[in-house]
Swiss-Prot record:
D-glyceraldehyde 3-phosphate binds at K203. Gene3D superfamilies: Aldolase class I. Belongs to the PdxS/SNZ family. GO terms for biological process: amino acid metabolic process; pyridoxal phosphate biosynthetic process; pyridoxine biosynthetic process. It catalyses: aldehydo-D-ribose 5-phosphate + D-glyceraldehyde 3-phosphate + L-glutamine = pyridoxal 5'-phosphate + L-glutamate + phosphate + 3 H2O + H(+). PROSITE patterns: PDXS_SNZ_2. This is Pyridoxal 5'-phosphate synthase subunit PdxS. The gene is pdxS.
Amino acid sequence: MSIVPAVVELEKIRDFFYRLAEARDRLREAGFRHPAEVPLAVGTPLVKLGFIAMLRRGVIMDVTNVEQAQVAEEAGAVGVMVLDKLPYDVRKAGGVARMADLKIIEEVMDAITIPVSAKVRIGHFYEAVLLEQIGVDLIDESEVLTPVDEQHHINKWLFKTPFVNGARELCEALRRISEGASMIRSKGEAGTGNVAEAVKHFKAIYGAVRDLTAHRDDEEYLRDYARRCQVPLEVVKLTADMGRVPVITFAAGGIATPADAAFMMWLGADGVFVGSGIFKSQDPERRAEAIVLATAYWDDPEAVAEAQKMVSEKASMMGIDIRALKPEELLQTRGV
C-alpha cells in the first residue's frame, strides 16, 4: 500500500473513533457515568492506531520470562506478550489464570527494546489500570485468562494505552472496536498448536466483510446488520467502505509453523501472535526466526520455503486435537 492511501485510511479510522468519543461524552453529560469510574488519561485515537499500524507484517510472541523475551527480540519479533503461563500450560494447569506478575513484566520491559504487552482478564478493569500504570505498550483483554465478567468487557475508552481483543466473527470484532479496542486478533483455540480454528475465524470475519461491502449502498441492510451486532451504524458503514476490519487485525490461536503464519497472512491478517507454538517446541530460537521470516515475506513462496526448512516437524510442539475438547474446555467461547 502506498503512503497516500494508507494516510487516507488512517484518517478515516481516526475520524470514526473521534465520533465515538463524542458520543461517549454526550452520554456522560446526560449522566450516564459508571459510579466507580477512575479518572484516566485518554490517549488520542491517532496515537493508539498509529502505534499499532507500525506492527504490520510482524510477529508478537508470548513469553513468560526475560530469557524468552530476549529470544523473541533476537529473532526479530515486533513485540512480546508477557503471561504467567503459556496458553498450553494454562490449559493443562486448569484453575484460575490471572495477569502475570507486575515484577516480571517490568523485568522484561527493562531487558528488551521492543514493545511489551500483557494480558488481563476479560472485564477486569483494575488489572488494566495496573498495566497502564507500569507503562506497558499494549493490553490484551484475553479469553486465555479466566474472565471476571461474563457479560461486559472493559471500557477501553478510559485508557491511553491501546487494547487488543479477540474475535471469532465480525459482529464480535465490531463490538470490541466500539468499546475502544485499537486492534483485533482472531481467537483461534489458544494452546492447541492447531491453527484450524484461527483459519475458520478469519474466514468468517472476512466473509462477513465482503458481504457488507457488497451491500454498502443499501442503508437498510447496513442498519439491520448494526442492530443485530449491537454496534453503532457508523462502524458498520466504515467497515463496508473500507472493505476490511477498520483496525489492524492479527491472526492468533494455534500458529506453530512458518507455513501456518504465512497462510494466515495470505487470508488477510496484518500480522500474527504466536503463543505456545514457539516456546513449547524443541527448537524455539530457530522456530522464532523462521516464523518472523515467513510472516514478513508471506507473499514470497521462496522465502517461506526457506523459513519452513529452518524447522523440523519432529521438534514442533505436541498439538491438541480440538475435536477431542469438551465444550467447557474451549477458550474461544469466553467473552463474546
